UniProtKB/Swiss-Prot annotation:
Reactions that this protein is recorded to catalyse: L-serine(in) = L-serine(out); L-alanine(in) = L-alanine(out); L-cysteine(in) = L-cysteine(out)
A GO biological-process term: serine import into mitochondrion
Chain's role: Amino acid transporter importing serine, an essential substrate of the mitochondrial branch of the one-carbon pathway, into mitochondria. Mitochondrial serine is then converted to glycine and formate, which exits to the cytosol where it is used to generate the charged folates that serve as one-carbon donors. May also transport other amino acids including alanine and cysteine.
Name of the protein: Sideroflexin-1
Organism the protein comes from: Sus scrofa (Pig)
NCBIfam families according to UniProt: mtc (TIGR00798)
Mitochondrial intermembrane side: 121-146, 196-228, 288-322
Record flagged with keyword Transport: yes
Topology Mitochondrial matrix: residue spans: 2-102, 168-174, 250-266
Family according to the record: Belongs to the sideroflexin family.
Amino acid sequence: MSGELPPNINIKEPRWDQSTFVGRANHFFTVTDPRNILLTNEQLENARKVVHDYRQGIVPPGLTENELWRAKYIYDSAFHPDTGEKMILIGRMSAQVPMNMTITGCMMTFYRTTPAVLFWQWINQSFNAVVNYTNRSGDAPLTVNELGTAYVSATTGAVATALGLNALTKHVSPLIGRFVPFAAVAAANCINIPLMRQRELRAGIPVTDENGNRLGESANAAKQAITQVVISRILMAAPGMAIPPFIMNTLEKKAFLKRFPWMSAPIQVGLVGFCLVFATPLCCALFPQKSSMSVTSLEAELQAKIRETSPELRRVYFNKGL
């Protein structure tokens, strides 16, 4: 290998220690950086070339370690990890903050009428479907039937929750009504994610030892992984949907918004965006991507298999997903 860089930098793994919350947070702040969606095709292709060349042992003269890591994260932000295909722009992790701030801000501004609830909950679940399809597993891709079932079920659940709570909160404080969209999003996540990953709940997900040696598949591990993802997704939405209602409830009583009511939506979108810039990476970092559980928590058959092959093993590891 020529060039200044050593040959053993593992750019298949994140740059920071993923066993610590700070390391995971640094990783996800980089992965979800909204500036990456502004990169040109030429910049993306250059990053892909740097990454592919480095993996083949070729380094351009003068390339620094920081530049290599920057290329790796640009590559990861735009290309599917399994297939290597360029991902749909709005389905990329770097599009999460700008897309969610727009959709969530509008959901929280236009929540009082049934047509508005139907429209914005449909838009939100359509966006979620695009994200889930874009980031589908290359080894076990979602079928059209699975994607459609999850999409319709999550949209129905979100709309039913929103309309039901709107009816219940008609005679209470307007502030309480502002939290209806959050309840709808939480309900949709509880429906959407398990349905999207129903195959894993049936057949299990691969579990390994600490060194990555595959031991089998576990549905119990899938349940833990999906639970962690649902919790992360709900908490991710919480700051952007819980803090702005208090602020907007106060602002809408002021002369400025009474004079310029059309400013409500842009202000709400901005407040949600500010919260999401921090909430998205921090909540992604709550649980390690390489999650673990005790061998005694696995299915009896898998426990027996592990006792035969690795009697001293106490914990197994698996990818929890996002």
